[in-house]
Amino acid sequence: MNLPVQTDERQPEQHNQVPDEWFVLNQEKNREADSVKRPSLSYTQDAWRRLKKNKLAMAGLFILLFLFVMAVIGPFLSPHSVVRQSLTEQNLPPSADHWFGTDELGRDVFTRTWYGARISLFVGVMAALIDFLIGVIYGGVAGYKGGRIDSIMMRIIEVLYGLPYLLVVILLMVLMGPGLGTIIVALTVTGWVGMARIVRGQVLQIKNYEYVLASKTFGAKTFRIIRKNLLPNTMGAIIVQMTLTVPAAIFAESFLSFLGLGIQAPFASWGVMANDGLPTILSGHWWRLFFPAFFISLTMYAFNVLGDGLQDALDPKLRR
């Protein structure tokens, strides 16, 4: 007996369907949440951005720019020649005609101050550049080679570092005679030692990084690796050291001038002018010492605060 086949004709249950867009993530909002708000900046741009936030360092930078500009155009702003003498205008105080007064020979102190700025700043910058060239090459090779070569090169540095700096400079000045070139040579004989030690320490830290090892693997020569891979990553410390070398050289030149071993007449530097003006303080001629000493102090202060600012700005650990 065939039983009738019962078919389930029940309709499928109707469920309330949730719109698909409810389950779609808001990609735009997630993308905004995951994105970094800080703009992409290069190392140099980021360092400049942080340096601009340091008001003291920026003040030092503007002071130095002012001094360098005045060293170029300052002597031309005065109608008086740097070597012109006038026995009727001896030791005149600052006035509308002589803005910084005159010296014992009637020469305009304003003109001589900015002419002396050329020599003082030139000595400082040249000493820093020579220290940079010698110190970077010497320290870079010592740090990169390592081993016995590094030990020998560092023993030489220790010997030079142990010598009395000013004694060596004075001895060279006596042997070679006074002059601008002699001063620069004397200041750089041992002045590069500090730069070499800093560069060596930086190179020792980064010479085993992957990109340096890759250059070695592809057969790059030592000086190419130092120039292309190592030096660009040590420039922060090098620049800071140079900003400290310049005022040190200016101060050393001023000290030598106080000892009578500086620039010879009729030329003048800030140190020579300060040395000439020192005995006149008791006579009431204060301006002869004040202006050169003031600009020496201002230059050293500006370089030091700029160096501190650059040290903070160029430090990769401080990047945000």
From Swiss-Prot:
Principal subcellular localization: membrane
Any one GO molecular function term: transmembrane transporter activity
Topology with respect to the bilayer: Multi-pass membrane protein
Residue span(s) of domain ABC transmembrane type-1: 117-307
GO cellular component terms listed in the entry, alphabetical order: plasma membrane
Subcellular locations according to the entry: Cell membrane
Gene3D superfamilies (UniProt xref): MetI-like (1.10.3720.10)
Induction section of the entry: Nutrient deficiency conditions, which also induce sporulation.
Transmembrane feature ranges: 56-76, 121-141, 154-176, 230-252, 267-287, 289-309
Protein family (similarity comment): Belongs to the binding-protein-dependent transport system permease family. OppBC subfamily.
Function: Probably part of the ABC transporter DppBCDE involved in dipeptide transport. Responsible for the translocation of the substrate across the membrane.
Protein name: Dipeptide transport system permease protein DppC
Taxonomic path: Bacteria, Bacillati, Bacillota, Bacilli, Bacillales
Gene designation per UniProt: dppC
